Structures are given as C-alpha cells and as structure tokens.
Amino acid sequence: SYGNMPIGSSIKPLSVYGPAFDLGNSPGSPVINAPLKIEGWTTEKGYPSNFSDGSYTGVETLRYAMVKSNNTSAAQALFSYVGIENSVNYLLKLGVSSNHIEATGAGLALGASGLSMIELAGGFAAIANKGEYLEPYAFTKVVASDGSIYLDVQQEQIRRQVFKESTAWMLVDVLKQCVGNNGTGSKAKFGGFTIAGKTGTNSDYRGVTFAGMTGYYTCAVWIGCDNYKALVSN
C-alpha cells in the first residue's frame, strides 16, 4: 500500500503509451530515441538516459520503445504525442490519487511517481477490461448476521470508460510482447499462459515492479526493502 516508492517503467502504459494510442497514434507510430534535448524536459542535460548508451536507435516505433522500455523514447512520446496535462488526467481517471502523481517528465515518462500497487493493478485491470476502469475493492459484499446485504461492491463500485476499446487492444498486444523472449519482462512468462505486462525499476535498484495480466487476473507487485535500501541487483 506504500504510495511513495517510485514504480519506474511500469507506469508507461498508463501515462504515456495508452494516452498516445488513445489520442490517435498506434504501435507503429515513430518516436525519436536519441540523446537530443527534449522541449519540456527540465534537467540540465535536457533528456533522460536509457538503460545503456547502446540502446539509442535514432527512430523507432512506439511498440519497440515500450517493449525495450527506452526512457528517451518515452519522454519524447510524452511531450510529442500526449502532454503533461493529458497524461495526468488519464492517471486520475484510472483511479490514481493526485498525491501520488509527480506531474513532470520524470514522474510520468520514467515512473518517478509513487503509485500504490492497488492503483497500479487497477490501471492495468482497465487495460484488460477493454479500457473500462473498475474501482478496486478488497471485498465483494458485506453481509449482516441476518443475511441482509450491508454493502455490495456492484452497487458501490465506480466504473468509467477511460481508454477506447481499440486502445486497450493495442496495449495488450504490445504488453504481451513485453513479456516475450525479447522483452524486459520475459521472466514473467510461465505455465503456457498468455501473459501481458510491464516491468519497472527505479533508481539504484531500490525497488522492482511488475504489473501484468492473464485472461483471468490482473496483479501488481513491488519487490524491495521496507527501509528503501538498494537491492543487490534487478
């Protein structure tokens, strides 16, 4: 339930690529992946670094950018295709508390924002549910001793369409590739299931995140130390 631990790249489908697809782009749309200054990026260098210098490809598709989790591409896509305000609004509609959103390039494109795992799972569940967000609950109903229903989630639960169905389909298609042999989440593929998901690693390996879905369930996990101590590796 921690909301102050950055979730890293797991945020990208919710804050960058989902909104980009929803606003008229596609997995095949081009994005610049090069060490060039990005208008709107506020660090002195002017752009975020990728995991390795050899990952700069020049121009790549949004699909490739998400599968390889390239930070420079995500930042370019955020400022070229989405915008800070739109990105924040999508996260709010996906049930993320405004207190957990860092409305900056780093917060939205790199995952410096500290979403809780129930917020992250709720966002990915909306992707799995054809773009419709259903407020997560830890129960289905509360029944009194006489059998009367005190609370029923189906009556209390907030529901809203956040992404178009076509956007959700494109996201699932790309997220399946993220868990494929060449994706950053390949180790999450198991048991012959169709799995779609996205990894996230924050600075100094202080935490590792994965949010994913099958045809039955959506889950989000954060692996790290209670004292936020750096892990040995990712």
What does each of the following model-derived ranges do?
Residues 28-29, 98-108, 135-139, 182-188:
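Surface-exposed patches in mature extracellular/periplasmic domains of secreted proteins
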